[in-house]
Amino acid sequence: MPIYTKEGDKGYTSLSNNQKINKDSPIINFVGSLDELNAMLGVCAASLTEIDEEDFSTEVEVVQDIQRDLFIVGSIAVGAKLKFAAEKEVSNIEKTIDDYSRLLPKLKNFVLPGGDITAANLHLARTLVRKIERQAVALNSKSMEPFLPYLNRLSDLLFLMARYVNYKLKKQEIIWKT
């Protein structure tokens, strides 16, 4: 069976309930941004596995868990009857944030994204999460409410993971100066 269906050639796509919808609809933009984030996280995971100086297998696992969550969020957004344990996932992220926070030097200034390429890509992923969060709010839908705390914490987690990669690789954080 070919990957192409030709159904989208006229600017429409189908939701999981087979409802046809414009490809420029806010919900399709939201799901497209989730896909973009998922691909960026794939770049981050691949990059983490290429680092020889340190073992980042735990970070790869964290990233892949997030990728799985994003598929669920996107599926639910377009009508799939899946469950997402938002409170549990937020709690898991908060625990991971706390773990990284204990390992890192206290931050006293804003930092510019950069350092190691993997850290820079984690920062890029963080900005994609913020975009998705704004899109979820703009959808103004009850179905988005459980995802908002998850997305909010997720950007914090990716920020700390970027800092952690730089810290472990002894890359200097670039302090923002006015």
Where in the sequence are the language-model features?
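Phosphate/pyrophosphate-binding loop motifs in nucleotide- or prenyl diphosphate-using proteins
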Residues: 1-178
